[in-house]
């Protein structure tokens, strides 16, 4: 199967990508899990550094991302720029506040001391829609990565370029290799990913 993004205004092809086979998808999940094993032990202040860098990349390239959204799914150019900038704000926000949000909470019980602690889950699958192709992903990815998780993304099939651009942002920002990956798969393959023993 080939994924092809079509400019909705002109009907012309923008790009095309081959669907990943299950063996490749499984390998990506395993690589993401390996990256997670180190990332989960990374202090919040160190997790925040690449997330803030991701925010800066989004700002610096907001016009490029706005153009990509316009080409793949028809979002007005200025709205795409605003969406990229909103994603940057989310990156900054979670980089600055995640440690406070995830601090252990003391609770009253009969025990000498009781508390709730928040621990990373592992590799988290995100299945995302096309209408806000950057925002829907970053509103998941920014807090998920700051919480110490890894992420794999199955984006809508009409915005493959956006999906790969987002993966590249996390790479360029300096996150560990394979911590966030895009899966080029169709909807029928999602259940197989959900059932993978390393996906949480």
Go through the PLM ranges and name each one:
Residues 1-113:
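N-terminal Rossmann-like NAD(P)+-binding subdomain of aldehyde/semialdehyde dehydrogenases
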Residues 107-200:
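Rossmann-like NAD(P) dinucleotide-binding subdomain of oxidoreductase/dehydrogenase enzymes
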């Amino acid at each position: 199967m080939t994924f092809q993004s079509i400019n909705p205004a002109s009907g012309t092809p923008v790009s095309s990508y081959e669907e990943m086979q299950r063996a490749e998808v499984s390998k990506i999940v395993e690589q993401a899990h390996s990256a997670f094993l180190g990332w989960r032990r990374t202090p919040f202040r160190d997790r925040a550094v690449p997330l803030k860098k991701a925010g800066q990349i989004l700002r610096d390239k907001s016009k490029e991302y706005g153009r990509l959204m316009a080409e793949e799914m028809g979002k007005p150019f200025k709205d795409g720029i605003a969406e990229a900038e909103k994603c940057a704000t989310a990156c900054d926000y979670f980089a600055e506040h995640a440690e406070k949000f995830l601090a252990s909470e003391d609770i009253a019980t009969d025990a000498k001391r009781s508390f709730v602690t928040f621990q990373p889950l592992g590799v988290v699958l995100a299945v995302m829609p096309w209408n806000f192709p950057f925002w829907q992903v970053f509103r998941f990815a920014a807090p998920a990565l700051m919480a110490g998780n890894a992420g794999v993304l199955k984006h809508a099939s009409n915005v493959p370029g956006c999906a790969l651009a987002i993966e590249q942002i996390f790479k360029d920002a300096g996150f560990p290799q394979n911590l966030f990956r895009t899966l080029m798969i169709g909807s029928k393959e999602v259940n197989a990913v959900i059932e993978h023993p390393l996906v949480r």
